[in-house]
C-alpha cells in the first residue's frame, strides 16, 4: 500500500453551534460539508474534535482531561494533520488554526466548510491563514489527497461519499468558494 501524504489526521469542527444558524452566511452549507467530513472521518478512522470559543480569550478551547489525553496520544505519533471546518472564519477558525500551527501541526482549512456572519470576512481570513502556513483546500480535495490513490482500501468508500454529496458539494463550492 502507498504511504499517505497526510499523516496523523484529526478533524476539528470549530464552534458550529445551532444558535448561530440565523447569523452565519450560508450556515446550512457549512453544516453539509462538516457532515460529509464526519462521514469520511468515520470511514477513514480519523478522530474528531468539536471546539468552542473560550469566552475569556479567542483561542482553542481548553480541552477536558479526556480530550487532552486523546490529543496527547495522537501527538505521540508526531505532528497532527488538522482538518478545520466551522465558524467564524475570521475568529474561531483563525485562532484555532494559528494555535495549531504554532504548536507545530499541519493545518488544512476546508474552504467549502467555513463561513462568517459577514461573507466578506471569509476570503480575507483564508488568505491570511494561507500566508501563515495553513493549506486552504476543499473537502473533496482533502479526501482524495488523504486516501492517495485507487489502490487504497478506502478509495471506493470515499468515491461513494463524493457521489452521495455531489449536489451539496457543488452548492457549497459555488457559494462559499467564490474568488
Task: List where the protein language model places each region.
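Conserved beta-strand edge residues that scaffold enzyme active sites
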Residues: 55, 114-115, 143
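Generic beta-sheet signal
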Residues: 51, 110-112, 139
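A contiguous pocket-lining binding segment that forms or flanks enzyme active sites
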Residues: 81-86, 90-133
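Helix N-cap and loop-to-helix transition residues
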Residues: 5, 118, 138-139
Amino acid at each position: 500500500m502507498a504511504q499517505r501524504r497526510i499523516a496523523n489526521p484529526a478533524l476539528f469542527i470549530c464552534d458550529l453551534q445551532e444558535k448561530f444558524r440565523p447569523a452565519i452566511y450560508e450556515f446550512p452549507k457549512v453544516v453539509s460539508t462538516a457532515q460529509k467530513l464526519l462521514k469520511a472521518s468515520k470511514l477513514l478512522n480519523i478522530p474528531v474534535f468539536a471546539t468552542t470559543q473560550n469566552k475569556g480569550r479567542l483561542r482553542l478551547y481548553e480541552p477536558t482531561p479526556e480530550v487532552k489525553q486523546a490529543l496527547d496520544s495522537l501527538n505521540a505519533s508526531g505532528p497532527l494533520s488538522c482538518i478545520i471546518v466551522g465558524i467564524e472564519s475570521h475568529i474561531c477558525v483563525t485562532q484555532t488554526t494559528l494555535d495549531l500551527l504554532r504548536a507545530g501541526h499541519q493545518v488544512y482549512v476546508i474552504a467549502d466548510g467555513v463561513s462568517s456572519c459577514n461573507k466578506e470576512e471569509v476570503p480575507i481570513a483564508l488568505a491570511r491563514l494561507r500566508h501563515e502556513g495553513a493549506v486552504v483546500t476543499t473537502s473533496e480535495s482533502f479526501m482524495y489527497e488523504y486516501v492517495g490513490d485507487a489502490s487504497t482500501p478506502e478509495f471506493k468508500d470515499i468515491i461513494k461519499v463524493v457521489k452521495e454529496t455531489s449536489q451539496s458539494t457543488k452548492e457549497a463550492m459555488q457559494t462559499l468558494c467564490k474568488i
